[in-house]
């Protein structure tokens, strides 16, 4: 009996090639719709019939990508952890893209806000409007002019790929929550969100808005016409109120900004809908961030420290967790985060993107080629949503 590992006769090999190229298109589309981005690109190059089927399919991406924003550039760079040695470059995203910062994302959509130095220009000029941009198709939706001098804080972006509905929520100042959704002509106050003063972290998941302040965690249900508060609990004993705390005694000859202890608290909603409080800390004169995670246990409103996320991983920029089991290039029980305090740069903030391994309590950086490309450029993690018309990455 011939070994199945040995190549068959030429005619048999030709028949095998013919079988691969003549698979039913509905079966091939079923397969293509379940491939990640890297495998999708490889599969469509197998033969002309596979390429044809791929045009009616799109990758099913569950892997977080990194986006880098080179300073004063109208393009950005994308890194797929599945492909360690490759960076994708987007084409020109517009002149005002270089003058704006990404303040939130949902799928492949970015919420862009003008940099502070451009805020005081003519408000009628388009580059001073907030806008949302699909990074992969370049589809753009301009938002109404926002009057507050410092723009939108605690921003939230949500989109629906099928209906093209979109929702933007944020704080215009410490006591005023505003929103804009598809069909609106202007920003609207959300009076039912009163009582979220000093909110510094928001997450929108499954039509619920989670609001975290120094004192309270509140949850609002957005599934109806009017948001309804469905949960409230105290967090005042858990959080660090100040973002940065200076050393008690200043060291001579060292800039004051290098002597700051950096603190930041964030909120994360897990796949199961549990709320986590993530406490970040970087000591003065140090490059190393450390993290503590707290989870509310039961109905007793008590927060307990947790050291394991199981098969999940935190995407701190998005305030969510994703399933990381069997995901190539993604580590389970880790925190993927960008610099939590970008406005307090010092000589120890050499990098903008990190991975914290909860098993070893160590901070790692992505692949060397990513970390060395455009150092000190802004970066964040996001979950791209690939569409059939979005394959123009270089």
Curated annotation (Swiss-Prot):
Pfam families: Beta-prop_KIB1-4, F-box. Residues 17-63 form the F-box domain. Signal peptide: none annotated. InterPro entries: F-box-like_dom_sf (IPR036047), F-box_BR-signaling (IPR050942), F-box_dom (IPR001810), KIB1-4_b-propeller (IPR005174). This is Putative F-box protein At5g66830.
């Amino acid at each position: 009996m011939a070994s199945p590992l040995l190549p068959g006769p030429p005619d048999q090999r030709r028949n095998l090639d013919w079988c691969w190229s003549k698979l039913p298109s509905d079966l091939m589309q079923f397969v293509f719709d379940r491939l990640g981005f890297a495998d999708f690109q490889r599969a469509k190059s197998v033969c002309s019939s596979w390429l044809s089927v791929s045009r009616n399919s799109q990758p099913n991406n569950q892997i977080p990508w990194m986006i880098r924003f080179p300073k004063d550039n109208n393009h950005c760079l994308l890194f797929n952890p599945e492909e360690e040695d490759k960076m994708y470059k987007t084409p020109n995203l517009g002149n005002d893209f270089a003058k704006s910062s990404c303040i939130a994302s949902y799928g492949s959509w970015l919420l862009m806000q003008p940099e502070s130095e451009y805020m005081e220009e003519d408000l009628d000029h388009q580059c001073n409007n907030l806008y949302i941009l699909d990074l992969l198709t370049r589809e753009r939706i301009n938002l109404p002019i926002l009057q507050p001098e410092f723009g939108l804080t605690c921003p939230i972006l949500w989109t629906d790929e099928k209906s093209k509905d979109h929702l933007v929520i944020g704080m215009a100042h410490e006591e005023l929550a505003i929103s804009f959704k598809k069909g609106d002509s202007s920003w609207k106050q959300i009076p039912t969100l009163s009582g979220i003063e000093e909110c510094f972290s928001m997450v929108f998941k499954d039509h619920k808005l989670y609001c975290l302040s120094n004192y309270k965690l509140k949850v609002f249900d957005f599934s109806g016409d009017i948001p309804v508060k469905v949960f409230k609990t105290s967090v005042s004993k858990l959080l660090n109120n100040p973002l940065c705390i200076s050393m008690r005694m200043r060291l001579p000859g060292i800039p004051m900004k290098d002597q700051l202890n950096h603190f930041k608290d964030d909120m994360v909603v897990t796949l199961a809908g549990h709320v986590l409080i993530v406490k970040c800390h970087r000591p003065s004169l140090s490059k190393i961030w450390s993290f503590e995670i707290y989870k509310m246990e039961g109905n007793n409103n008590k927060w307990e420290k947790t050291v394991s996320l199981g098969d999940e991983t935190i995407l701190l920029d998005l305030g969510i967790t994703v399933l990381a089991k069997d995901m190539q290039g993604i580590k389970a029980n880790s925190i993927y985060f960008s610099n939590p305090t970008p406005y307090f740069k010092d000589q120890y903030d050499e990098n903008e993107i990190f991975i914290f391994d909860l098993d070893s309590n160590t901070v790692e950086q992505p692949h060397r080629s990513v970390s060395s490309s455009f150092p000190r450029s802004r970066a964040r993690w996001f979950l791209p949503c690939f569409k059939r018309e979005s394959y123009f990455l270089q």
